[in-house]
């Protein structure tokens, strides 16, 4: 299992690699759970400041859930438990204490696409394709939470079109609708850019990024409470450090508190 989800730390950046290229990085339950575990605690000592999530090889970021897992679904509870499990994983990615970057190459579909959407930033190679082709493949559906994530990102009309037509979007089309922010020639270029982005955000104020992640999540859920986020940032040591550093024209030394 450990070999199917690799985790490497280099400096302040952690990289999660879905490592099942022979199966287009199709995900088992254990693989989903391992991704969630890492996102919940990228490092025990807080040294990891940004996470990259990617897939091994250039054929797929992740083609979705391993289809063989669905053969055991017999009762309504099986379907509900599956979606609840996936939601816990996606929530762990969304609420990770550090920014997450999906570095995509190849197929990013189904469950793989939901992981990418749950990340804070998404960049892709030219050979990438995106979509939720369940209307022409399995005949299942997305959970309400996943529809909400997609609608918040690209709008209800585009989500409807993606699902009912079961059409896969190429990288250029995905960028045009805001599903990804950058397109690069190949996986090597994507990984280099992901590392650059990760190192950039790793040097920024941790509390600002956490507050922004949480605020956007709350907005998607229709919430308007933000007092705790405002107080957390404005009353922090980092805010005082930022003020002093700005006035002294030096680089701030962020502590995340």
What does each model-found stretch correspond to?
Residues 121, 161, 165-167, 173, ...:
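Well-ordered beta-strand positions
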Residues 21, 123-128, 180-225, 255-257:
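C-terminal long alpha-helix characteristic of the crotonase
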Residues 97-107:
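A short, small-residue-rich loop immediately preceding and capping a beta-strand
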Residues 1-54, 91:
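Conserved CoA-thioester-binding segment of acyl-CoA-metabolizing enzymes
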Residues 4, 47, 55-92, 136-138:
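Glycine- (often His-adjacent) and acidic-residue-rich active-site loop
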């Amino acid at each position: 299992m450990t070999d199917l989800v690799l985790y490497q730390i280099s400096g302040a950046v952690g990289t999660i690699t879905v490592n099942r290229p022979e199966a287009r990085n199709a995900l088992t339950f254990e693989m989903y759970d391992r991704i969630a575990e890492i996102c919940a605690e990228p490092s025990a000592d807080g040294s990891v400041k940004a996470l990259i999530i990617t897939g091994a090889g250039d054929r797929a970021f992740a083609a979705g859930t391993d289809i063989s897992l669905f053969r055991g679904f017999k009762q309504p509870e099986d379907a509900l438990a599956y979606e609840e499990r996936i939601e816990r994983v996606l929530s762990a990615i969304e609420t990770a204490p550090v920014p997450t970057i999906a570095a995509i190459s190849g197929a990013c579909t189904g469950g793989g696409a939901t992981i990418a959407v749950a990340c804070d930033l998404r960049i892709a190679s030219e050979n990438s394709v995106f979509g939720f082709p369940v209307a022409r493949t399995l005949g299942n559906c997305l959970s309400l939470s996943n529809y909400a994530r997609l609608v918040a990102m690209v709008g209800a009309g585009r989500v409807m079109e993606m699902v009912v037509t079961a059409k896969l979007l190429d990288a250029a089309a995905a960028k045009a609708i805001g599903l990804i922010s950058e397109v690069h020639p190949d996986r090597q270029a994507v990984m280099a850019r992901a590392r650059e982005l990760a190192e950039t955000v790793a040097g920024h104020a941790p509390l600002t990024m956490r507050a922004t992640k949480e605020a956007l999540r709350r907005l998607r859920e229709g919430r308007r409470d933000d007092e705790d986020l405002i107080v957390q940032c404005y009353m922090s040591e980092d805010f005082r450090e930022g003020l002093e550093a700005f006035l002294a024209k030096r680089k701030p030394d962020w502590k995340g508190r």
